[in-house]
Amino acid sequence: DAEPAELAEMQHEFDLHPLAVEDAQHGHQRPKIEEYGDTLFAVMHLGEHENGRTDDLHVGEVDVFVGRNYVLSVRDRSRHGFLGVRARCEREPELLRHGAGFVLYALMDAIVDRYFPVIDAFECELEQIEEKIFSPGTARTNIQQLYDLKRRVLVLKHAVAPLLEAVGKLHGGRVPQTCAGAQDYFRDVVDHLARINGSIDSIRDTIATAIQVNL
């Protein structure tokens, strides 16, 4: 997590917009992408299961400042870094010709990829509950587990749905100049987010049906 002094130094060095810096300093922001002149400020949420445990969902935040010649990321409550993103950019330097927008895409792609194992775990957990849904004497336990799963699925929904809406603006219509060279890549992120969002809605519908069966 960045200290206030570090953010102040970044603001001075890169002429970052004060409102974006304030958001990064306070954290707990809704996923979004905002334009400040010729720069972008993006907020994304990480949803991760820790140490193989699927009964708890750890949510972190990554704030990203994107300018013509720089990309700065600030992590808040996020336990994993993005060395893989740097390695990818170094492994495929020709893609950097698309500018800072490609680095933003690579960061987004890495974050979105981490949603898929969470979805898989949710679906597996739901299947396990469904297998015992008609077993005698399990209704109370089933409902407790279903409501707990519903809560965690909603947390992921709040990470995915706003980001899907925001990223859609980076490949269609008036694309911010900072990302103009990488707009085709953002379409790939939108496709992944739409798939994940659809899976979340399907899981929520199944949970609602299962709760009704147990009532």
Enumerate the language-model features and the residues they cover.
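Peripheral, non-transmembrane regulatory/ligand-interaction domains of membrane transport proteins
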Residues: 1-202, 208, 212
